[in-house]
Amino acid sequence: MSAGGRDEERRKLADIIHHWNANRLDLFEISQPTEDLEFHGVMRFYFQDKAAGNFATKCIRVSSTATTQDVIETLAEKFRPDMRMLSSPKYSLYEVHVSGERRLDIDEKPLVVQLNWNKDDREGRFVLKNENDAIPAKKAQSNGPEKQEKEGVIQNFKRTLSKKEKKEKKKKEKEALRQASDKEERPSQGDDSENSRLAAEVYKDMPETSFTRTISNPEVVMKRRRQQKLEKRMQEFRSSDGRPDSGGTLRIYADSLKPNIPYKTILLSTTDTADFAVAESLEKYGLEKENPKDYCIARVMLPPGAQHSDERGAKEIILDDDECPLQIFREWPSDKGILVFQLKRRPPDYIPKKMKKHVEGKSLKGKDRADGSGYGSALPPEKLPYLVELSPGRRNHFAYYSYHTYEDGSDSRDKPKLYRLQLSVTEVGTEKFDDNSIQLFGPGIQPHHCDLTNMDGVVTVTPRSMDAETYVDGQRISETTMLQSGMRLQFGTSHVFKFVDPIQDHVLSKRSVDGGLMVKGPRHKPGAVQETTFELGGDVHSGTALPASRSTTRLDSDRVSSASSTAERGMVKPMIRLDQEQEYRRRENRTQDATGPELILPASIEFRESSEDSFLSAIINYTNSSTVHFKLSPTYVLYMACRYVLSSQHRPDISPTERTHKAIAVVNKMVSMMEGVIQKQKNIAGALAFWMANASELLNFIKQDRDLSRITLDAQDVLAHLVQMAFKYLVHCLQSELNNYMPAFLDDPEENSLQRPKIDDVLHTLTGAMSLLRRCRVNAALTIQLFSQLFHFINMWLFNRLVTDPDSGLCSHYWGAIIRQQLGHIEAWAEKQGLELAADCHLSRIVQATTLLTMDKYVPDDIPNINSTCFKLNSLQLQALLQNYHCAPDEPFIPTDLIENVVAVAENTADELARSDGRDVQLEEDPDLQLPFLLPEDGYSCDVVRNIPNGLQEFLDPLCQRGFCRLVPHTRSPGTWTIYFEGADYESHLMRENAELAQPLRKEPEIITVTLKKQNGMGLSIVAAKGAGQDKLGIYVKSVVKGGAADVDGRLAAGDQLLSVDGRSLVGLSQERAAELMTRTSSVVTLEVAKQGAIYHGLATLLNQPSPMMQRISDRRGSGKPRPKSEGFELYNNSAQNGSPESPQMPWTEYSEPKKLPGDDRLMKNRADHRSSPNVANQPPSPGGKGPYTSGTAAKITSVSTGNLCTEEQSPPPRPEAYPIPTQTYTREYFTFPASKSQDRMAPPQSQWPNYEEKPHVHTESNHSSIAIQRVTRSQEELREEKVYQLERHRVEAGMDRKCDSDMWINQSSSVESSTSSQEHLNHSSKSVTPASTLTKSGPGRWKTPAAVLPTPVAVSQPIRTDLPPPPPPPPVHYTSEFDGIPMDLPLPPPPANQAGPQSAQVAAAEWKKREEHQRWYEKEKARLEEERERKRREQERKLGQMRSQTLNPASFSPLATQAKPEKPSTLQRPQETVIRELQPQQQPRTIERKDLQYITISKEELSSGDSLSPDPWKRDAREKLEKQQQMHIVDMLSKEIHELQNKVDRTAEESDRLRKLMLEWQFQKRLQESKQKDEDDDEEEDDDVDTMLIMQRLEAERRARMQDEERRRQQQLEEMRKREAEDRVRQEEDGRHQEEERVKRDAEEKRRQEEGYYSRLEAERRRQHEEAARRLLEPEEPGLSRPPLPRDYEPPSLSSAPCAPPPPPQRNASYLKTQVLSPDSLFTAKFVAYDEEEEDYGPAGPNSYSGSAGTAVGAYDAPREAREKLTRSQDADLPGSSGAPENLTFKERQRLFSQGQDVSDKVKASRKLTELENELNTK
């Protein structure tokens, strides 16, 4: 036992002794306990001298360690010194009270027994008896039957008896023999009579006097006791419902039992039942030893005016056990007569009133049953048949048929209700007919639905109407049907019950050991189906399968515990009375029914005694900690082994004392083996964590177990020592590992050495340690203590290097900034892991030391700031740091008087504080953390593990196969592992739980309005659920976060239903929508609440379900593999890794890729999206591991905390873990906002959203996802939303929505920039993209500042500060080129404003203006692209012509459509100013809908808006004004919160720390505003203020770093664009070649067919041309006649169709459209030429214009041009252009066009023969 535990026990013992001494005579005063808990006191003993017929008494001083045997030996000498010489008697010591006596066990401690009289201030005596003495013959016969002689020598004189005397003697012997047999049958009664006889003799011969008693003043003591009992009862009355009239006194008469006592008055409440009144009355009458079930209370009604003693005309009715006497007495009308209550023995033939309806007039024998009992007799309640509910709160009964057992073994169903079927008719319906009826509500339930009849041992069900839906085993019935045990009974559509008849089950259980009717359905685990319940009357009933026999399953039926545990609770129990306890349990078990629930462990283990050592050695010595699936398997196996040794199954032949010694020996052997294993593996961190977890869990099991705790005190001490020893070894291992990487803190960034350790190595070590502890399920309290040691080690190592090595130069501004920056990574990691308090506490000295090195310390005004900031540094440490300080070349020196003043202040503050705490003032930090090791009080696995944990069976399988042991599951166990724990009143717990469920409820809950002031968040955890009969979802309070606004208000409680928030109804809303509404509220929120709505709607069990954390623990524990991240976060990239420049991308193959889930699994996984996602240890999934999402019923009740938001992150696993144990993670509780509900379903086709899950090669959670959305963490105090930023957010979102159609940039949306809570927090985030700013925290800024120390990629996620803005994510890997085959060296010009979709004219003008401003930047690139286009134009024209009919559906494309080989993801980031800075710090993160993510784009204008090379003066001015307003608002907010905190009288430590940080932030903001104001007033004025210089220096450094980062990102972007363009060009060329080949084939076929038709027409045309030749020679030749005639029906195209855009290319449509708008002449457009007379004159239309007058010149030439028109029409169908295209012109026409400078070179080639024919015609 630890020192703390022993001190606590000693304190409790001292309190008990103090109470004894206060009430007892001084003679019997007991001394105070020693360190070993030993005490002494005087005791009075009596000796019964049978020979003398009297009692002797003596007082001796006894020790608490003296046993009964020791005392007997002493008393034998004291009372009769010559006894031992004359005989060898057997003595016993008895504890005697007025009500009886008890013999003490030989090993009991008499002084401890006497001290236990304290409980009720009892009085008693100790009597020594000689067991060999016969009962004194006080009536021995001498000379006749009437004659008596004095006892003595003469009593042995014998005489001859007469015949009559012999006959009488024989008769008396027979009577004595009969009485002896009766005594054997009723041992308790016999014992009671013997006890009463001895007690009567003792108190008769030695009456109560001041000499014989121990109590100093009995009257005062008893009065005080009565007063205390009265006050306790009155307090119970007040606590029930607050009414003063809920309790009172009641007279109980007992004329038949104690005729000499008129009555006793007992204190009752109006809800106390008759059975309670019986127990209280028996105690009042001194009959507490009697069995209350043998007695009853009868109400006797006397006529008005009659006396109590007058029984004439009295009518007596026996009260049932559940009737309330005081309530009956109060409601009794006085005109009916006088009502009195009599305590009397219960008649043997008594039948409760509820059973009399169908028994009166019938034979009481009833129908004979197999067990010999009939229903006609008075059955105990536990033998009555009953209905147990299978689907409480479900909408349909299918929940029963497909119930699911979760990974932790819990059932998907809630706690069942149970209804006993009395010997009568039980009505079922919505109406309450009487106390016996079953009232149900729900669809399909009629007012009088059906009747259940229990008569003559048969139970039947009869529907009352045809509309009453009643099903038996799934079949609907309409007439009376007999029920058999195990049948399913359904009423309506939502109530399913199982009918159980214990008597039938008992018969079947005799035939088969395990032949029960099991519930149908998948049996995932033994013990999963739990149907145990407790009725209001206190009876325990079972609704599970049939019982197995005691010989196989009740391993612990005779478990060892103290006798009458209720009477001895809270007493001193150094030794347990095993034999009496087992005798008591044997008597008790005779009265219990075998079908009751077995209150035993979920499983037990059996092993042979011969293989005990091998079994224990296999469990402890040969267990490989790295391969165990369930890490606590040894603990649970060893605990089951201990319980097995204590049970009667293990060697039933041994005595209880031997069994106790055996259990002690087994536990000692376990502990000894465990000690050896820890010693052997003291250098292996994984094994140490494993055994530390198991040792602490086993110690908790043994300490809490009510039987083991008192017999294994030595083993408990050793186990506690083992936990501490393993802890010490593990700390040493981890500190040794850390020591190797500690030089990383002193790594000079200017000396970039690859061999030296980096800060990432330290973080990797810490993360490996955390992962190890969580996998091993180490208690959270031990985890915090261990990391406190590691943080102290870091603090000690660095601080001692600073103060002890003055020549190293570390005491300088430069190194102070470096160390402080590195410590920032540790702090950020600790905050992410929930260890921020431990880190803040144990790193405080080195943090304050680095702060001192970097802060101002040059003038006396700095002294108060130094002392207030460095308050933990003592005078020696401050002096060493300041005296050893190395100033930079241009840094002022520290004045000596300043050092002296600072040291003097520290001597009066820090030094005095240390001395008052008993610590020495020393320079160096102590290597050992001066904190005691504390064993956790709670937080152990047994509180949450239910049934048999997953992995335990696998752990035992090898041992079972070798015959070492056997695991026996107990299917009827309640499923808890705390069943044997001290104070685990499991029965009353379940009884109380079901009593609450069975209470009739009011029709509607109370509606109240609550107004909360949100300071640190609303502080509620909500859950969405639908109650029975409800049509819509409701939002219920799952829990109230301690310290939140709701907790402070006090009116909200778990189970309340939230009806509306700020007037907006929450009824019918989904959980995530409700959470969104609740977070989008102002600082004052008004809630409409239905008090305890969950209970009114049948959702009371919802409140008992484990929180998400517990669920996750169970999930993770159940499967042994890390749970996959919630689907809601699959769209989010880990921006900390691939978004910031300090984290270069790793190859694709180094990222873990999740397995593709099947459809059902994916659906189940999606249903779990919105559950809280705990922040796990950032470790990769187990190799080959699959998450526990299997097809089955997923949990549909989810919890959201509106007071806590945390980020969900995942880290890549490229490097091995520091402490690999490849299974099992352990989670920590976080409340996380759920993702959008739209993520539960796939996007519709038109959404253009990629179906991630249908692309196995796409890694949905990797850093290559095309959509990067950063979810921002918020601590609870930062979860405030200000209305002033609401408009700004909507403006940004609107801007994004306007760009939805553009896909040039697919980037992050709704990124929220968080405000830092203190100035120092600005400097230590690895996410910062301004490295120079991290080292310019303070100081004049005129001396050297180190460059940024950027961490290299590690296997764990980088430390992420949640109070700093997140880095922008990378751009998408896929980037579709605007131009096929064109390498892009620089970004393209941005699209014009009208490309972005419908916008207002003002916004469009702004967009166009920005485009013009950036046009110059792009001129070179555009010119080069124009040249490329010109060169490629003809090739593009040919490709586009073939793709007219191949336009692809935009829906078929996705951002990842062409991502073929993403080996090198882009590291490009967009500038941080574009979107992130426009979302303000206190803004709530909105729920991202999937529709929001469809091609969210950022235009290139925005991309370059932060570029200093092309500033936008208008935008910059507007931005500066906005920033100024925001800064002012931040300062106002800070002032308001600071004022609120300062006004608080009692601030917590967290509030004080927050106030300090807010003050720093407020000062910083004020200085920043002042500096800006000065700059505006006078830009030329030199600002000498050091703080202003610091601020400007930092801002300038940020700007420079941002410019460098942007330039670097721009170059990376261009390089990636070129690579992707080359890939696209190669792919498109291949596609083009394939299409060209297909086109050539089609063209060849078509031209062949055309030529055949052409030859036939050619001859006819030639003849006509010959006929026209003469006429043509006579007519004057006009130029227009030399071209081929146009067809008769040809109409020139209008001007509006001039651009005639070609069809889109086979890339994304949006990309092509941008290309067209960006450069209208970039692609070839066919030119239509209408050559006529006006063309010859070069009219205003121009050569390329189209005139509508061409048709007028055609009509005169109909006949001679008929053939040519036919030819032209046939060619028009095939050529891409119209008939006016250049390829249709004659040679002369081409010559004419050529002479005019027009392009006629593009001509579709025909066959050689066709060309020759055409030339022949043209020349004629």
UniProtKB/Swiss-Prot annotation:
Question: How does the record describe its quaternary structure?
Answer: Homodimer. Interacts with F-actin, nectin and NECTIN3. Essential for the association of nectin and E-cadherin. Isoform 2/s-afadin does not interact with F-actin. Interacts with ZO-1 and occludin, but probably in an indirect manner. Interacts with RIT1, RIT2, NRXN1 and BCR. Interacts with ADAM10; the interaction locks ADAM10 at adherens junctions following ADAM10 recruitment to adherens junctions by TSPAN33.
The species this protein was found in: Mus musculus
* Chain's gene name: Afdn
Q: What are this entry's molecular-function GO terms?
A: cell adhesion molecule binding
Q: Which PANTHER family match?
A: AFADIN
Q: What is this protein called?
A: Afadin
Chain intervals with Pro residues compositional bias: 1364-1373
Which Gene Ontology cellular-component terms appear in the entry?
adherens junction; apical junction complex; apical part of cell; cell junction; cell-cell junction; cytoplasm; hippocampal mossy fiber to CA3 synapse; pore complex
Q: Where is the composition biased (Basic and acidic residues)?
A: 173-189, 356-371, 1113-1128, 1152-1172, 1252-1262, 1407-1440, 1487-1503, 1513-1526, 1595-1675, 1759-1772, 1800-1820
Q: Where is the Ras-associating domain?
A: 39-133, 246-348
